[in-house]
Amino acid sequence: MKKMETAIAILVNGENRSAKLDATVADLLRELGLDSGRVAIERNLEILPRPQWSETRVEPGDRYEIVQFVGGG
């Protein structure tokens, strides 16, 4: 019997990571512990608009650059 995969390989900010099968980009942010209100996401060299985060599935081999905004003086 063949074992079903439950995780997929992706790249986040240049580091190899895994994501749950069928995860959305919003799920990925939660898994990484990031505040979705303070980040911008590039997926496969294209900016991913915030309204699409909960609709966009993480796919094997996706490359993400996630930039966090930090306030300060």
Regions inferred by a protein language model and the residue ranges of each:
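Ubiquitin-like/PB1-type beta-grasp interaction modules and other compact soluble beta-rich domains
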Residues: 1-72
